[in-house]
Amino acid sequence: MKLKWESISNLQQNTYLIKLVAATLITCLAFRFFVFRFGQFSPVQVSVTGNSNSQISPTSVILSDNEDQIPVDIEVEKCDLFTGKWIKDPLGPIYTNESCGIVVDAHQNCITNGRPDSGFLNWKWKPNDCSLPRFDSLRFLQLMRNKSWAIIGDSIARNHVESLLCMLSTVEKPVEVYHDENYRSKRWHFPSYNFTVSNIWSPFLVQADIFEDSNGVSSAAVQLHLDKLDNTWTDLFPSLDYAIISSGEWFLKTAVYHENANPVGCHGCPESSNMTDLGFDYAYNTSLRHVMDFIAKSKTKGMIFFRTSIPDHFEDGEWHNGGTCKKTEPVGEEAVEMKVLNKILRDVEINQFERVVTEMGQESENLKLLDFAGMLLTRPDGHPGPYREFRPFDKDKNATVQNDCLHWCLPGPIDHLNDVILEIIVNGRTGK
């Protein structure tokens, strides 16, 4: 009997253990089903709050299934996209001089023109406080379906629009649908997305009578109307969903200034003109004041970026007197200093931007600043240099040729401006 009791006792214990294990398994399966079922119900949007100065890894946000919608009301950690450094990028550019040769201006097609080094292509911009995703051409086009862009300004604006078109052409080739008489203003269309990109030539953003040839040689001083905006861009402005507006370098040219249809002074004019030299900073301040006020008061629903002027890297001279740029890789901040003229231009731009934001308040909320000056200051290696012309040293390796240390090779550093712009559009980061 004793043995029989022990057997029954053991059996009861085993039965108890089996029931316990089974109950545990059922509970785990039910929990997993709950998490899986409801975790898949909708994307999770992560909001990061707290101390904005703390080091937090970038927020991963799952977007809606509708890829054409730009996410709104998504909080991500603050990050100054314009303060950082260039780091090695083994992947290199997303397009090549060959894949986008038809869009690129011949003067910026450095590799085709014979530039012997290619190391300048293998760098990318890394902000100090966050990661910056690689430009996603497909994502950009999906977001821009049925929308219109314009990049407005001088030849650097043209340089930038060509960069953007080349990056987007990895998904779909743009079709040129318009050009002006001198082929300076153009428009392209991406048919599959009904997306248009315009490049508007307006180097001063205000009305100007310019007397120079295709090589930039002037036969007379520019007649600049500081208080009259150039309708080449203002007429198009109300229809735009996005615009990048810039100016700067052209204000350094010799010019006569007009306000209220009367000459009021000049810059760089001869003493015999009997006019007061007001300085280019006066003209730039006055013009930008009218530009910024127009944008802020326009009540546009589009997103308008104002890009600061970008410094050149001429050494031992300038464009017209033998300046060169021979560096082949980025430099540290401590190794380069912005030129005085570039500082003056940038100061005017920052001051006018801050003024209009302060004065207009919410009326200026769609106006954003793109301050790429510091970012590109450390890339003296990214210019065509002597390779603005096709194979300039083939006939004479010691030939004296004009260098371009202002514009940017394509592909090249200017492509990474688009990384920053897409991050601002998608995640709402405004930089500073």
Curated annotation (Swiss-Prot):
So which domain of life are we looking at? Eukaryota
Instruction: Cite the InterPro entries for this sequence.
Output: TBL, TBL_C, TBL_N
Q: Which UniProt keywords apply?
A: Membrane, Signal-anchor, Transmembrane, Transmembrane helix
Quote the cellular component terms of the Gene Ontology held in the record: Golgi medial cisterna; membrane
- On whether Transmembrane is a keyword of this UniProt record, the answer is yes
- Which ranges belong to the motif DCXHWCLPGXXDXWN motif? 404-418
| Membrane association type | Single-pass type II membrane protein
Motif (GDS motif) positions are 153-155
Give TM segment ranges: 13-35
Molecular function (Gene Ontology), one example: O-acetyltransferase activity
Subcellular localization is given as: Membrane
The record's PANTHER family line, in alphabetical order, gives: PROTEIN TRICHOME BIREFRINGENCE-LIKE 23, PROTEIN TRICHOME BIREFRINGENCE-LIKE 9-RELATED
Q: What is known about what this protein does? A: May act as a bridging protein that binds pectin and other cell wall polysaccharides. Probably involved in maintaining esterification of pectins. May be involved in the specific O-acetylation of cell wall polymers.
What does the miscellaneous comment read?
Answer: Contains 2 motifs that are conserved in esterases, but it is unlikely that this protein belongs to the catalytically active pectin esterases.
Annotated family: Belongs to the PC-esterase family. TBL subfamily.
In Swiss-Prot or TrEMBL terms, this protein is called Protein trichome birefringence-like 23
Which organism encodes this protein? Arabidopsis thaliana (Mouse-ear cress)
